[in-house]
């Protein structure tokens, strides 16, 4: 089975535990810390794959090295070790990430295309209006300037586009007059 698929399964399970226990921020932070610690200390991974160390010794090393992380993260690390999949930790850490947690918190990403730069107040107003439309608590809006827009704003949320541009309104009027 593909390593990425396996890592996603473990990440998904860890994410569900984080949601159930209300520890999403803590577990996200812990997973990032584990990832960084392993990236900075490559010898640790080599030590865990050393055949002369028993499984209990390796578990003790993990418990000692990651004593400060939450129990679900520590248990996931131990489970990966038992199943000879500890090498998946960096990939697992990449999958327990912002997109999934922002969705769980009711945050969606959006892009607002406008003819000129929008103010923070305008972006906040757009966020409030469109968050309700898509059933989210808030939107993280990125403003992209499109010089072809005469006026108004086009907002893209996921694969949906809301056309509030002047040219879009003129096109709708033209269609009504013709049809």
Swiss-Prot record:
Topology in membrane: Peripheral membrane protein
Any one Gene Ontology cellular component term annotated for this protein: proton-transporting ATP synthase complex
Keyword annotations from UniProtKB, A to Z: ATP synthesis, Cell membrane, CF(1), Hydrogen ion transport, Ion transport, Membrane, Transport
InterPro entries: ATP_synth_OSCP/delta_N_sf, ATPase_OSCP/d_CS, ATPase_OSCP/dsu
Location(s) in or outside the cell: Cell membrane
Residue ranges that the Swiss-Prot or TrEMBL entry lists as coiled coil: none
Keyword Cell membrane in annotation: yes
Assembly notes: F-type ATPases have 2 components, F(1) - the catalytic core - and F(0) - the membrane proton channel. F(1) has five subunits: alpha(3), beta(3), gamma(1), delta(1), epsilon(1). F(0) has three main subunits: a(1), b(2) and c(10-14). The alpha and beta chains form an alternating ring which encloses part of the gamma chain. F(1) is attached to F(0) by a central stalk formed by the gamma and epsilon chains, while a peripheral stalk is formed by the delta and b chains.
Family membership noted in the UniProt record: Belongs to the ATPase delta chain family.
Descriptive protein name: ATP synthase subunit delta
